[in-house]
A protein has these predicted regions:
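N-terminal leader/targeting and accessory segments in enzymes
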Residues: 1-94, 98, 219
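Phosphate-binding loop of NTP-binding sites
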Residues: 20-24, 61-62, 73-225
Length: 225
């Protein structure tokens, strides 16, 4: 069991991983400025229902008892928790970096592409669940069928070794994912040039141990060797 601090825990990507790790039995503590401003935030209540401790985002809740800290990429370098984590020597990683580590512990299906990732990853996890495959799921969007009083719909903790993730190329960490299977939906000018994104998709394909499924109707995906 790990003791994990999530800074920026209210965002869709970070809250998904925090919820997932709490459901897997880990000790989860987090902070978010949106919770400081609005304690009635719906994600706040869902996390609290999972026994996640929420603290002010001023560094006061962070100490050396934590195994590591996961930061949202929206958290600034001069934020109090970043400064304190560096000062007391707690290992630090961004949300995408931590997701890449989680991927290695499962037979992961990574859903990539410049659009449609959230929808496709959610649909795939839902279909797998209905088929009795008991999948794990960490997404960016919220799946209506997964929403409950205790679940925002962006993650489920199944009891199988299968994990479905949304693999975003925006910050470049997609090249660190090593999934079993990959699905690449499309390729358009988005966060990066078509050529740069194609190069990242090529690396993802090289890191994929099993099948790679590409949309053959997308002309830009022809740029992915």
């Amino acid at each position: 069991v790990s003791k994990i601090f999530f800074s920026g825990i209210g965002g869709s990507g970070v809250s998904a991983i925090a919820s997932f790790m709490a459901d897997k039995g880990h000790i989860v503590v987090g902070s978010d400025r949106s919770f400081d401003d609005n304690p009635a935030h719906p994600v706040y209540n869902i996390l609290k229902s999972k026994n996640v401790s929420i603290v002010p985002q001023d560094g006061s809740g962070l100490d050396s008892s934590f195994d590591f800290v996961v930061f949202s990429t929206a958290v600034e370098a001069d934020q109090p928790e970043v400064i304190k984590a560096r000062r007391i020597g707690i290992p630090m990683q961004t949300r995408p970096e931590y997701l890449a580590k989680i991927v290695t512990g499962f037979k992961t299906i990574a859903v990539a592409g410049t659009s449609g990732k959230s929808t496709t990853a959610g649909m795939l996890a839902f279909i797998m669940q209905r088929l009795g495959m008991r999948p794990n799921f960490i997404g960016g969007g919220r799946v209506k069928q997964f929403k409950t009083e205790h679940n925002a719909g962006n993650a489920i903790a199944g009891d199988s070794d299968r994990l479905v993730i949304e693999a975003c190329e925006s910050d470049g960490t997609i090249i660190d994912y090593k999934p079993e299977h990959s699905i690449i939906l499309n390729l358009e000018l988005d966060h990066h040039s078509v050529e740069k994104t194609a190069a990242m998709f090529e690396i993802l394909g090289g890191n994929t141990s099993g099948m790679i499924i590409l949309n053959s109707d997308d002309a830009h995906l022809e740029k992915v060797p």
